């Protein structure tokens, strides 16, 4: 269940508006995959404003301290949302991309494993953090990001994304692990 301070906007027509502008690229990056491309949402200023406003209105009264974004499209969304909410932004990067002392978390992918890192001083104990990415597929990256933030003493108030691909099991995994999750729209299949 979501934090009582988080207000869920009435997404009715907004969800359809945004969903209709997400491009589906068949057979990319491999045959059988339906890639959900959010770049059309970012390219149109009106659409980008609508998208960001969904997140801003949801979290404006959530008493957050930081927004953390997952490499790479979570950086785009997270930084803009943080700016609009007058909060700091924390990048969660792929291994080897941060210059200072880091904390790392390995997670499993369909085809192996990967590692994400965060600066060791990225947040303080007790910080309330929104964790944001573009899409929830298997949930591994967001779960790893949550673990990093919690290892530094932060509380991840909610995970957020534009797209949920529920058939890949990520949203269920995250919710079963106790992470409240907000997504703007969902697509069946993968």
UniProtKB/Swiss-Prot annotation:
Pathway: Purine metabolism; AMP biosynthesis via salvage pathway; AMP from adenine: step 1/1
Assigned GO CC terms: cytoplasm
One Pfam family here: Pribosyltran
Keywords tagged on the record: Cytoplasm, Glycosyltransferase, Purine salvage, Transferase
Subcellular location: Cytoplasm
Catalytic activity: AMP + diphosphate = 5-phospho-alpha-D-ribose 1-diphosphate + adenine
Class of this enzyme: transferase
SUPFAM superfamilies, per the entry: PRTase-like
Domain of life where this protein originates: Bacteria
GO MF entry, a single one: AMP binding
EC number(s) from the headed UniProt entry: 2.4.2.7
Matches recorded under InterPro entries: Ade_phspho_trans (IPR005764), PRibTrfase_dom (IPR000836), PRTase-like (IPR029057), UPRTase/APRTase (IPR050054)
Family: Belongs to the purine/pyrimidine phosphoribosyltransferase family.
Function: Catalyzes a salvage reaction resulting in the formation of AMP, that is energically less costly than de novo synthesis.
Cross-referenced HAMAP family: Aden_phosphoribosyltr
Annotated PANTHER family: ADENINE PHOSPHORIBOSYLTRANSFERASE
Subunit structure: Homodimer.
Name assigned to this protein: Adenine phosphoribosyltransferase
Gene: apt
């Amino acid at each position: 269940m979501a934090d009582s301070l988080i207000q869920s906007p009435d997404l009715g027509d907004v969800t359809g508006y945004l969903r209709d502008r997400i491009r589906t690229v068949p057979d990319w990056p491999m045959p059988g995959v339906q890639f959900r491309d959010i770049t059309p949402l970012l390219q149109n200023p009106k659409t980008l404003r609508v998208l960001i406003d969904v997140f801003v209105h949801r979290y404006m009264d959530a008493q957050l301290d930081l927004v953390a974004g997952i490499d790479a499209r979570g950086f785009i969304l997270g930084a803009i949302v943080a700016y609009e909410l007058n909060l700091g932004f924390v990048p969660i990067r792929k291994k080897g991309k941060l210059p200072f002392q880091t904390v790392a978390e390995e997670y499993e992918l369909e085809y192996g494993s990967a590692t994400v890192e965060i600066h060791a001083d990225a947040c303080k104990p007790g910080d309330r953090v929104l964790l944001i990415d573009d899409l929830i597929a298997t949930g591994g990256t967001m779960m790893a990001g949550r673990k990093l933030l919690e290892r530094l003493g932060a509380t991840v108030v909610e995970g957020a994304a534009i797209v949920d691909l529920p058939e890949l099991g990520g949203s269920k995994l995250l919710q079963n692990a106790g992470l409240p999750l907000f997504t703007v729209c969902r697509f069946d299949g993968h």
